[in-house]
From Swiss-Prot:
Molecular function as annotated in GO: extracellular matrix structural constituent; extracellular matrix structural constituent conferring tensile strength; platelet-derived growth factor binding
The species this protein was found in: Homo sapiens
UniProt protein name: Collagen alpha-1(IV) chain
Cross-linked sites for S-Lysyl-methionine sulfilimine (Met-Lys) (interchain with K-1651): M1533
Pro residues bias (residue ranges): 196-214, 367-376, 413-424, 436-448, 1247-1258
């Protein structure tokens, strides 16, 4: 299949989709012709609108049809071998080939979409689980989706997890830049001796030597060649030579680097190389033709036919409404980019930016200088190397010492000398036989003859004797036997012929002649016998030849690395390589550094071609910045009120009740009716009178409450400083490669950095008007730079991205354009940015265009702009109850609720040891209700003035018939309050009273934790009546409303406590009430801009107990409180010696809270406390003498008694519970301590208030007009200007503030009580509040401790009647020590007592004077090691660790970024990836690790590659699964695409913790506590595993924080596909740890089915804990 055909096939589905969209749009269009009876609304055509936002990128157009093949040309001459050609055109169809092998079965298709939900069934009973049914038939596979466009390249990833230091040996770093040349290192160790060099070339022959002494004339011998002798043994080393003269050279200077050497000889053949895998071979020959295939399936519908001839022009129809925005048009013809502007001047340096992310990997640096020499470490022995070349001859050695060697063997006989001159005539003495004369003198040496040929090597001689003392030269031996004749010599020079003399005898050996010059190098002699071995250390033999390679030795110890060699000289430039094939496309590069901003370019050439049609009015532009404030205008005219008749109003409120009618006759009693439906909950009745019952038993811990709504977002942070500009990289080499095939148009790339300014090119031919490109990415806003020098006037630049600037000047009139055909209806565009409140300036009127040709009727237009809001209607009547909807999105935070119920009272703790007397505390809260007192006795009571005791309650009588209503009597005067009777039974509920005056709303409570969205529950039965809440603080009286209808009878409230008050007088007529009932709850508004911090509110009611906060800083010292209870007197210690007071030092740093001190002695009597708050009671009569009471609280301590005698030492008591941290003590006397370490950096302070305005500056010189600046921030609102013209219809505004609170709904069923939270750490001490109003009288409290003596002006009661004499009381407890007595007389000196227990150490004395230095003692022996010291005091806080490396990931399961838990540090935010599925196999992420938090979201975040160097993206039926949010599914259940996916994907945060983090699971509905020494990070539900498509999935490690999700959902994740869609599917299951009762552990689990609303009752709870550091 050729490349063109494959493009056709790829684009065919896109064409069909477009065709389908077109037909759908046409069907929707409705009335588009002239038959619509609409009125003619043609008004005056408005002015030309602002330029709209750029449209979306168009789709890829259809490919053109393939042209016909041309005729075949004549063959040309044979040309040179050309470059490899482009792929040829598609050949003609060959004969059918043989049928191929059957293919592998295809991958399974994507599951089809779920059907719409059926009608709801009747809820059935919970049936038991049925048996597994037979497998159903497999469903039909769905259609495969279209491949999505390739995604944009991802940003460069962040550095990986820090898991501690990696040793440098394991990971090799990138090569660095060249270092500075190092200083020369010390001289290295001498190298090993090199091998012997090769023998030198043979030298030239030396000059002839002086003539030798004449030899004897030899016999003329025969010459024949003797046999070749054996090689002799190597001879003994010769005697040492004469010592040479040593010359000393001075040490040279540093060598300079030599010139480049000549090219060396070619090296030995290298080891075989390891090659890379070769490129794929050329295509093979075409295969055999295949057989005919089966008949093809029915083809796809054809392309639309050619358009028909145009119809007749119809009558002009009415103007249609503005249609929806059309789909993106096809890409326009791109006109070349304009020339780049000149490079701008270098700007002033910016302020240093914050520390950026780690930059991309740098380029390798130049090689550094050689390092210092390493220590030698022996390496392992290598394999034997190849034999090296023979070395050069070594230098001459030092002279050896001379020892005489043994005499050598006789040399070969020399050549015969010339014949000597004739001798003197002999002396005959007349005798014929002459006597031999004396030997003659040695003749002069003859002329040397020509050298003879070198003789053959003689036979091996006998081994010589070793000569021990060889001083005497031996005599010459006798002549040897005659040798064989030598070869014929060259003829000698002819001598003068003499007379032949008689041969003389041998002469005496002459003196040795001088040393001759060296002769020619002889042939090597035969190997001699081994000589005697004589060894002298000073003699050094000649270096032998290199041996053969030995066997590899044992590996040696590792040597230290050698010094680096000096850098080599640069080699010659290599020859250019062959042209390579084009490589695979590389991965996308990292994002480059942003370039500096270029200058504004010159204006482009004028456009070319006729002008286009006048476009629709554009969207309203971005509002301009606010203008400078105008002066306040004059007061306007009063507006005219045009009444508009509204729709009929809702039914009015009932009128006031009429006067009461006359009393009717009494009717007969009716038959009792059926019980009615449970009525609505009545209002809380008046509190009854009676004592409260005893407190009930402590309830079971309830479930934790839902999390409250999120708080208001914080103020936006400040912008960071700009980063430093990066280093510009080096220019790369130009690449070489063949041109590739033309690719499909790619998606728009990320805008590149601006290039440097090029030279201005020649203006090109004007191009056609291009389509508007896609909007660029929004850049990051930089900090404002320092003011630049005034530049020259720049030409207008391209429109920038960002807030709009001020309105530009009107443009010139363009040439008229042809009118284009109407476009297709587009998809709905993205919502625009919300505009500011002010309308923009009115635009200039555009020039009149030429009339265009009448176009065909267009598709329906965009919807019109939103009209102004109508006059609000009256509230409608209440509608029927609608179908239960799906859970809505979480609402904005509601008004703060009333304070919750008070928690259960805790058990009493053990009494702690009494501490020292503290400063008076603030006034405490109201105490708990006390237990009811014992019943009082009524003896000796004056019955005349007292109300009698109430009798026992009689049996309840039958309910009589209702009597007639009596007329109302006058109110009686209030009686004297009677004595309290015993508590009566609660009375029957009274009728519901008139509603009281509504109080002011209570102070807002703290926001509760955010609740998770519950599933849709079945309607529950009406809940029981809730417990009445605590009365709120008394509100200021409201204005009286109209009298309401009589309420239903309420249930009896709890009996109230208090004295009945007097009846008040009738109040005055109130003023009219505020406007009527609030309207319905408004839509959720957008989050407004955070306001300035408000003034502190009133003191709120107590909130519920929060999670434990970190301990606050100690508050300031409070006002003096009421006196505390005194401690038990301590045991008196021995008195220490008084120290002399030291000088007062500066106040030291605040210490840690100390442990409890030893109880002090009893304090002095305190001052009388403030009078208690309350009404004075009536004086009671004297009561009977009570029975002996329980031991009371200790009374106030008296003055210190006389010291008692010292008691025996008691046993150590059990340690008391840890007390609260004490208040800071008063400053002690201390010497100046050392300066402490710097504390950790504090939290950043609030931004300061703006400073005062500075004085006005000097007027500056008028600058040249600058370039257009970036839009500024919105200015402050100006003074109101004069009334402007009416503005255009604005963009939809930001959502309004929340409406007036709606009417109070019915009280919901009571929630499950939450667990009692752990006791919080003490908070910061608050500011003392204002004095509150008089509260409702509280319940009677527990008997308090004895109060301080009251003021003396209380009226003393009348004395009671004397009681009868009582029996003597029991012996009282030992009294407290009495008040201090008078000073006694000094007693006699007592007998000395036994020695006491040693006292505590006294205070340290002052430092003594320095004594004189003693003599130095002898050095002692070393002592034994001492015992371990005590643990030191806690050190200052350490510096924050950088390499904690404990990472924990937290998932919000909402669209908000989660906060890192307290004590951890944020690293980054991302999207919560649960697992991926590729090729039908799933791989999951641990939700507690950083791998589950991807920085970027994609429905297909991975691609797959094969062994053929091919990777595919979004081309297969793969899935990704992400944690989801509570966003409900759309009602259509259609897959979610595009930006609509964003609200469904959970966000996450990767945090760095200072210690290990783990999860603990309770397997109950209780939240498990963290182990000892661990603190809580968050609580949640125990999430174990999950499955989805193909029953594949993954799971969580239960020790990982990922197994503890903070919110429980039955479907906690969403499935996404490569085609860009996400949805929830019925085959997705989540698995959670269940709750297990201890008694059910080993029993068979009971099957059960839980419906919505009860799901959390069986899911285990968990907590994520971090080890405390």
């Amino acid at each position: 299949m050729g490349p063109r055909l494959s493009v056709w096939l790829l684009l065919l589905p896109a064409a069909l989709l477009l065709h389908e969209e077109h037909s759908r749009a046409a069907a929707k269009g409705g009335c588009a012709g002239s038959g619509c009876g609409k009125c003619d609304c043609h008004g005056v055509k408005g002015q030309k609108g602002e330029r709209g936002l750029p449209g979306l990128q168009g789709v890829i157009g259809f490919p053109g049809m393939q042209g016909p093949e041309g005729p075949q040309g004549p063959p040309g001459q044979k040309g040179d071998t050309g470059e490899p050609g482009l792929p040829g055109t598609k050949g003609t169809r060959g004969p059918p080939g043989a049928s191929g092998y059957p293919g592998n079965p295809g991958l399974p298709g994507i599951p089809g979409q779920d059907g719409p939900p059926g009608p709801p069934g009747i809820p059935g009973c919970n049936g038991t689980k049925g048996e597994r049914g037979p497998l159903g038939p497999p469903g039909l596979p769905g259609f495969a989706g279209n491949p999505g466009p390739p995604g944009l390249p991802g940003m460069k990833g962040d550095p990986g997890e820090i898991l501690g230091h990696v040793p440098g040996m394991l990971l090799k770093g990138e090569r660095g830049f060249p270092g500075i040349p190092g200083t020369p290192g010390p001289p290295g160790l001498p190298g090993l001796q090199g091998p012997v060099g090769p023998p030198g070339f043979t030298g030239p022959p030396g000059p002839p030597g002086p003539p030798g002494p004449p030899g004897e004339k030899g016999q003329m011998g025969l010459s024949f060649q003797g046999p070749k002798g054996d090689k002799g043994d190597q001879g003994v080393s010769g005697p040492p030579g004469v010592p040479g003269q040593a010359q000393v050279q001075e040490k040279g200077d540093f060598a300079t680097k030599g010139e480049k050497g000549q090219k060396g000889e070619p090296g030995f053949q290298g080891m075989p190389g390891v090659g890379e895998k070769g490129e794929p071979g050329k295509p093979g020959p075409r295969g055999k033709p295949g057989k005919d295939g089966d008949k093809g399936e029915k083809g796809s519908p054809g392309f639309p036919g050619e358009p028909g001839y145009p119809g007749l022009i119809g009558r002009q129809g009415p103007q249609g409404e503005k249609g929806e925005a059309g789909p993106p048009g096809p890409p326009g013809i791109v006109i070349g980019t304009g020339p780049l502007g000149e490079k701008g001047e270098r700007g002033y340096p910016g302020t240093p930016g914050p520390r950026g992310e780690p930059g991309p990997k740098g380029f390798p640096g130049l090689p550094g200088q050689p390092g210092p020499p390493g220590l030698p470490v022996p390496g392992q022995a290598g394999a034997p190397g190849f034999p090296g070349e023979r070395g050069e001859k070594g230098d001459r050695g030092f002279p050896g010492t001379s020892l005489p060697g043994p005499s050598g063997r006789d040399g070969l006989p020399g050549p015969p000398g010339s014949p000597g001159p004739p001798g003197q005539p002999g002396y005959t003495n007349g005798i014929v036989e002459c006597q031999p004369g004396p030997p003659g003198d040695q003749g002069p040496p003859g002329i040397p003859g020509q050298p003879g040929f070198i003789g053959e090597i003689g036979e091996k001689g006998q081994k010589g004797e070793s000569c021990l003392i060889c001083d005497i030269d031996g005599y010459r031996g006798p002549p040897g036997p005659q040798g064989p004749p030598g070869e014929i010599g060259f003829p000698g020079q002819p001598g003068a012929k003499g007379d032949r003399g008689l041969p003389g005898r041998d002469g005496v050996a002459g003196v040795p002649g001088p040393q001759g010059t060296p002769g020619l190098i002889g042939q090597p002699g035969a190997k001699g016998e081994p000589g005697e071995f004589y060894f002298d250390l000073r003699l050094k033999g000649d270096k032998g030849d290199p041996g053969f390679p030995g066997q590899p030795g044992m590996p040696g110890r590792a040597g230290s690395p050698g010094r680096d060699g000096h850098p080599g000289l640069p080699g010659p430039k290599g020859s250019p390589g062959s042209v390579g094939l084009k490589g695979e496309r590389g991965p996308p590069g990292g994002v480059g550094f942003p370039g500096s901003r270029g200058d504004t370019g010159p204006p482009g050439p004028p456009g070319y071609g006729p002008a286009g049609p006048i476009g629709d009015k554009g969207q309203a532009g971005f509002p301009g910045g606010p203008g400078s404030p105008g002066l306040p205008g004059p007061k306007g005219e009063p507006g005219k009120i045009v009444p508009l008749p509204g729709p009929p109003g809702a039914e009015g409120l009932p009128g006031s009740p009429g006067f009461p009618g006359p009393q009717g006759d009494r009717g007969f009693p009716g038959t009792p009716g059926r019980p009615g439906l449970p009525g609505e909950k009545g209002a809380v009745g008046q509190p009854g009178i009676g004592f409260p019952g005893p407190p009930g038993p402590k309830g079971v811990d309830g479930l934790p409450g839902d999390m409250g709504p999120p708080g208001t977002p914080g103020r936006p942070g400040f912008n960071g400083l700009p980063g430093n500009p990066g280093v510009q990289g080096q220019k790369g080499e130009p690449g070489v490669g063949l041109p590739g095939l033309k690719g499909l148009p790619g998606l728009p790339g990320i805008p590149g950095t601006p290039g440097e300014k090029g030279s201005i090119g020649v203006p090109g031919v004007p191009g056609e008007h291009g389509a508007i490109g896609p909007p660029g990415l929004q850049g990051i806003r930089g900090e404002p730079g320092p003011p630049g020098l005034p530049g020259s006037v720049g030409s207008p630049g391209v429109p920038g991205i960002g807030p709009p600037g001020a309105r530009g000047p009107p443009g010139g009139q363009g040439p008229p354009g042809l009118s284009g055909p109407p476009g297709i209806k587009g998809e709905k565009g993205f919502p625009g940015f919300p505009g500011l409140d002010m309308p923009g300036p009115k635009g200039d009127k555009g020039a009149q265009g030429l009339p265009g040709i009448t176009g065909q009727s267009g598709l329906p237009g965009l919807p019109g702009q939103q009209g102004a809001p109508g006059i609000p209607g009256f509230p409608g009547s209440k509608g029927e109850m609608g179908v239960m909807g799906t859970p809505g999105q979480p609402g904005s935070p509601g008004p703060v609720g009333a304070p919750g119920l008070p928690g259960e009272k805790g058990d009493h703790g053990f009494p702690g040891s009494s501490g020292p007397r503290g400063d008076p505390g603030l006034k405490g809260d109201k105490g708990d209700v006390g237990l009811p007192g014992k019943p009082g006795s009524m003896d000796k009571v004056d019955m005349g003035s007292m109300k009698g005791q109430k009798g026992d309650q009689g049996e309840k009588g039958q309910i009589g018939p209702i009597g007639e209503k009596g007329s109302r009597g006058d109110p009686g005067t209030p009686g004297v309050p009677g004595k309290d009777g015993q508590a009566g039974q609660p009375g029957q509920p009274g009728p519901k009273g008139d509603p009281g005056i509504s109080g002011t709303p209570g102070a807002p409570g703290l926001p509760g934790p955010k609740g998770s969205v519950g599933g849709m529950g079945l309607p529950g039965t009406p809940g029981e009546k809730g417990v009445p809440g605590i009365p709120g603080p008394q509100g200021s009286p409201g204005l009286p409303g109209d009298k309401g209808a009589k309420g239903e009878k309420g249930q009896a409230g709890p009996p109230g406590i208090g004295i009945p008050g007097l009846r008040g007088e009738k109040g005055d007529q109130g003023i009219a009430g505020f406007p009527g009932s609030p309207g319905e709850k408004g839509e959720k508004g957008s989050i407004g801009i955070p306001g300035m911090p408000g003034s502190p509110g009133l003191k709120g009611s107590p909130g519920s107990v929060g999670y434990p906060g970190s301990p606050g800083l100690p508050g300031e010292k409070g006002d003096k409180g009421l006196p505390g209870l005194d401690g038990i007197p301590g045991v008196k210690g021995e008195a220490g010696l008084p120290g002399t007071p030291g000088p007062t030092g500066p106040a030291g740093q605040k210490g840690e809270p100390g442990s409890d001190g030893i109880p002090g002695s009893a304090g002095e009597k305190g001052e009388p406390g403030l009078p208690g708050r309350g009404f004075p009671g009536f004086p009671g009569a004297k009561g009977d003498k009570g029975s002996k009471g329980e031991v009371g609280f200790p009374g106030l301590a008296g003055s210190p008694g006389i010291p008692g005698s010292k008691g025996e030492q008691g046993f150590m008591g059990p340690p008391g519970p840890q007390g609260q941290p004490g208040l800071p003590g008063s400053p002690g006397h201390a010497t100046e301590g050392p300066k402490g370490d710097r504390g950790p950096q504090g939290q950043p302070g609030l931004p300061g208030l703006p400073g005062p305005m500075g004085p006005p500056g000097l007027p500056g010189i008028d600058g040249v007009k600058g370039d257009k600046g970036n839009p500024g921030w919105p200015g402050a609102p100006g003074v109101p200007g004069p009334k402007g013209d009416p503005g255009f219809q604005g963009m939809p505004g930001i959502g309004g503030s929340p409406g007036i609170t709606g009417s109070k709904g019915d009280m919901g069923p009571p929630g499950v009580p939450g667990f009692q939270g752990p006791k919080g750490l003490p908070g910061l001490q608050g500011i003392k509040g204002d004095q509150g109003d008089q509260g409702v009288p509280g319940a009677k409290g527990l008997p308090g401790p004895p109060g301080p003596p009251g003021p003396y002006d209380i009226i003393k009661g009348e004395p009671g009647l004397p009681g009868p004499e009582g029996p003597p009381g029991l012996k009282g407890l030992q009294g407290l020590p009495g008040p201090k007595g008078q000073q006694g007389v000094t007693g006699l000196v007592g007998i000395p007592g036994p020695p006491g227990i040693p006292g505590f150490d006294g205070a340290p004395g002052q430092k003594g004077e320095m004594g004189p230095a003693g003599p130095t003692g002898p050095r002692g022996f070393p002592g034994p090691p001492g015992p371990d010291g005590l643990p030191g005091s806690m050190g200052p806080p350490g510096t924050p660790s950088v390499d904690h490396g404990f990472l924990v990931t937290r998932h919000s399961q909402t669209i908000d970024d989660p906060q890192c838990p307290s004590g951890t540090k944020i690293l980054y935010h991302g999207y919560s990836l649960l697992y991926v599925q590729g090729n039908e196999r799933a791989h999951g992420q641990d939700l507690g690790t950083a791998g589950s938090c991807l920085r970027k979201f994609s429905t297909m975040p991975f691609l797959f590659c094969n062994i053929n160097n091919v990777c595919n993206f979004a081309s297969r039926n793969d899935y990704s699964y992400w944690l989801s949010t509570p966003e409900p599914m759309p009602m259509s259940m259609a897959p979610i695409t595009g930006e609509n996916i964003r609200p469904f994907i959970s966000r996450c945060a990767v945090c760095e913790a200072p210690a290990m983090v783990m999860a603990v699971h309770s397997q109950t509905i209780q939240i498990p506590p963290c182990p000892s020494g661990w603190s809580s990070l968050w609580i949640g539900y125990s999430f174990v595993m999950h499955t989805s498509a193909g029953a594949e999935g993954s799971g969580q490690a239960l020790a990982s924080p990922g197994s503890c999700l903070e919110e429980f959902r039955s479907a906690p994740f969403i499935e996404c596909h490569g085609r860009g869609t996400c949805n929830y599917y019925a085959n997705a299951y989540s698995f959670w740890l269940a709750t297990i009762e201890r008694s059910e552990m080993f029993k068979k689990p009971t099957p059960s089915t839980l419906k919505a609303g009860e799901l959390r009752t069986h899911v285990s709870r968990c907590q994520v804990c971090m080890r405390r550091t």
